[in-house]
């Protein structure tokens, strides 16, 4: 089955072709970072308009790269949520219109299920069951995964997601958008031990997260340095390092608890923050200490992309899932509501 995948949940337009027998044939991505940087964050209306502009050229590009023609496509998968409604509607409308014109099925895919399954595109994919850490700008969740659509929420953030905390903290200390990669870059030049930030909610049982207080702690630290005339580039690096260390250690502690609670030894990390090198290294060390394994997608498939949507949609279509011809998207969509396959 050859599936065209379309991703438009936020500020990246992703298109890919995935074949159930041959694997990923082609993928293309256009990032709107430069468009939104001047505003310090994503402007939903601008994001939607740019998706309209980019979608069809990217579809033509992946068809050309894969050496395929439109008549060979068996189905279309598109992101139906969660995300920005206007942006989601661009992908959904395009998918349903093409599916109607080509007389093929279209299926809406859960954005976070796409992230969760992205490591399946690698040469050594994880086997079920496993624990997944979904960590992005909008989500921080620990999920037990027994199969596609078989999800048990173990814990999640009570306020800011980890990626959101990265971006907000970066903005507070004067870094450019997107802030997460900027903090990671500066942290490499940071002085270990100059600042020590708290590890929120690690001193109590459970698998819930909270990062809003950590963001406030970073702001107060930066303001104290600024009041003392010490708001220079090295201080930014030191604050970035302390913040990143706190987030990484908090996530690692909670992942270790989740693995112990479930009795599993396989951990998948997915979502944009899973590209963070410090997080990967910390989780690899933790899994090695318990003789377990950690899995993640290659960096370009950690952030939003069409390949993960094409793969996730293909699996559900192969399992017989169908969808009526209707344009429906959801800004909020708990993953536990998805049917198992």
From Swiss-Prot:
Binding site residues for substrate: 134-138, 167, 180, 276
Binding site for Fe cation: 111, 115, 304
Protein localization: Cytoplasm
One Gene Ontology term from the biological process aspect of the record: tRNA threonylcarbamoyladenosine modification
Enzyme Commission no: 2.3.1.234
Note describing how the cofactor binds: Binds 1 Fe(2+) ion per subunit.
Presence of keyword Chloroplast: no
Gene Ontology MF terms in the entry: iron ion binding; N(6)-L-threonylcarbamoyladenine synthase activity
Cofactor: Fe(2+)
Enzymatic reactions: L-threonylcarbamoyladenylate + adenosine(37) in tRNA = N(6)-L-threonylcarbamoyladenosine(37) in tRNA + AMP + H(+)
Keywords: Acyltransferase, Cytoplasm, Iron, Metal-binding, Transferase, tRNA processing
CDD domains membership: ASKHA_NBD_TsaD_bac
Any one cellular-component term (Gene Ontology): cytoplasm
Keyword Acyltransferase in record: yes
PANTHER family noted in UniProt: TRNA N6-ADENOSINE THREONYLCARBAMOYLTRANSFERASE, TRNA N6-ADENOSINE THREONYLCARBAMOYLTRANSFERASE, MITOCHONDRIAL
Family to which the UniProt record says this protein belongs: Belongs to the KAE1 / TsaD family.
Protein name in UniProt: tRNA N6-adenosine threonylcarbamoyltransferase
Source organism (scientific name): Pseudomonas entomophila (strain L48)
Lineage per the UniProt record: Bacteria, Pseudomonadati, Pseudomonadota, Gammaproteobacteria, Pseudomonadales
